[in-house]
């Protein structure tokens, strides 16, 4: 499942969202995936439990988090949700706080998680200017166009 296709088909983009805590921010992304029938509601608690156990493992770069759980924790099919926050939040990551871009990922197996999910995110943000381009997006179509341009350049 391609990032662009998943976001478009699942209508799982939320821009300039308001959240008080990192948990609220994660829930916005998971709720988009629940609404699209990509994950079960329990996926949210699984992510919170993993953070309690391992720390903020999904904060990948300055400003960027990729919340995700394990396939057996309620994943029905592979999919993505993209959330930008109006106000960046602390995720308690010593290097990469605060976070204002979240790409929530659900993968049906570890191979899909590594090869499909993470590689597409790395590809999108290989050009560091895409962080600011994404923050500037105000419509779902602008996000999808940015992803298309990035894929065309790759």
Curated annotation (Swiss-Prot):
Keyword entries, A-Z: Cytoplasm, Kinase, Phosphoprotein, Phosphotransferase system, Transferase, Transport
Pfam families per the UniProt record, alphabetical: PTS_EIIA_2
Gene3D superfamilies in the cross-refs: Mannitol-specific EII, Chain A (3.40.930.10)
Residues recorded with modification Phosphohistidine: 68
Domain PTS EIIA type-2: 6-150
Entry-linked InterPro entries: Ascorbate-PTS_EIIA_comp, PTrfase/Anion_transptr, PTS_EIIA_type-2_dom
GO molecular function, one term: kinase activity
Compartments, as annotated in UniProt: Cytoplasm
GO biological process annotation, one example: phosphoenolpyruvate-dependent sugar phosphotransferase system
Active site: 68
Species name: Shigella flexneri
Function text: The phosphoenolpyruvate-dependent sugar phosphotransferase system (sugar PTS), a major carbohydrate active transport system, catalyzes the phosphorylation of incoming sugar substrates concomitantly with their translocation across the cell membrane. The enzyme II UlaABC PTS system is involved in ascorbate transport.
Cellular component aspect of the GO annotation: cytoplasm
Official protein name in the record: Ascorbate-specific PTS system EIIA component
Domain of life per record: Bacteria
Free-text comment about domains: The PTS EIIA type-2 domain is phosphorylated by phospho-HPr on a histidyl residue. Then, it transfers the phosphoryl group to the PTS EIIB type-2 domain.
Record's keyword annotation contains Phosphoprotein: yes
Regulation: induction: Induced by L-ascorbate. Repressed by UlaR.
């Amino acid at each position: 499942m391609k990032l662009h296709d998943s976001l478009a088909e699942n209508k799982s983009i939320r821009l300039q969202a308001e959240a008080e805590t990192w948990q609220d921010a994660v829930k916005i992304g998971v709720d988009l995936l629940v609404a699209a029938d990509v994950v079960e509601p329990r996926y949210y608690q699984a992510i919170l439990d993993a953070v309690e156990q391992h720390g903020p493992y999904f904060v990948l770069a300055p400003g960027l988090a990729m919340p995700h759980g394990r396939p057996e924790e309620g994943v029905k099919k592979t999919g993505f949700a993209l959330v930008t926050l109006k106000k960046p939040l602390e995720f308690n990551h010593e290097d990469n706080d605060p976070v204002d871009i979240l790409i929530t990922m659900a993968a049906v197996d570890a191979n899909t998680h590594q090869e499909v999910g993470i590689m597409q995110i790395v590809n999108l943000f290989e050009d560091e200017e895409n962080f600011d381009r994404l923050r500037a997006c105000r419509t779902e179509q602008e996000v999808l166009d940015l992803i298309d341009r990035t894929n065309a350049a790759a």
